[in-house]
Amino acid sequence: SFDDNDRFTSVQLQTAAGESQQVSGQVLVDATGQQALLANRLKLRNDNPLLRKAAIWTYFNNARRDPGKHGGATIILHTEKKESWFWFIPLANDVTSVGVVTDHEYLLKGRNSIEETFAEELAICSAMQEKLADATQVDSLHVAKEFSYTTTQQSGDGWVLTGDAYGFIDPIYSSGVYFAMKSGELAADAIVEGFAKGDLSGSQLGKWSGDFDAGTNWIRKLVDKYYTNEFSFGRFMKEFPQHQGNLTDLLIGRIFYDGAGNIFQDMDPAVEQALGKMPLE
């Protein structure tokens, strides 16, 4: 709940036994993931209309991993016509997360059951079929849709958003966990500093959000390029090998420094050329 000045004062909790409890505090951190409880209550969530994607995923045992030191690597595999893509994420105890991602309309509209849809997409991804040839599915299928969003406000007096409650871009580069940890770290620093200064205002608790948004925007741009089918990262890197280090930085989340977006000085025109909107020189 909030007081008359819109400052956070307390939360109403329900225990495992079903009992209701009122807990007061000075700062509320919304780390509720894509449930985004506070962001949804305050109507701060803004879905990205350009990334209306959906995913179907599950878990397998005994999937074929790459040998040696690459056995734990996350792998992205396209279907035949690049209408969708699969993730392959090795986890502990021989469990592998496997999911398919594509446009919401393509994946979930006018199709059969999610089991049949997943099987149909798998049937047009021979590389993933090979990895799952000896695997056993150990969980039911899960569905997520329209998961790309931002928030119009990330902090207020006595509250702050972090992780997926703050926003989510796309699963393609597996950046969500890193951004969740980074935003949590930055929010914690701002809270500690706020207590020391006696300032728990929205501007203090969210003082880091501007720089954070500037960095994550480079990943958002990279995702947009990935979903431009006419554009090829491979061809781009052959033409502009000087950006290899910059691209690597983006892919590993090293985005909070001056020059992190330099690659787009050449990539933006290359995409325009690929789309036929710009003449070749």
Give residue ranges: language-model regions:
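FAD-dependent flavoprotein oxygenase/oxidase catalytic domain
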Residues: 102-104, 128-130, 136-137, 221, ...
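Tryptophan-centered motif/residue detector
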Residues: 27, 57, 85-87, 147, ...
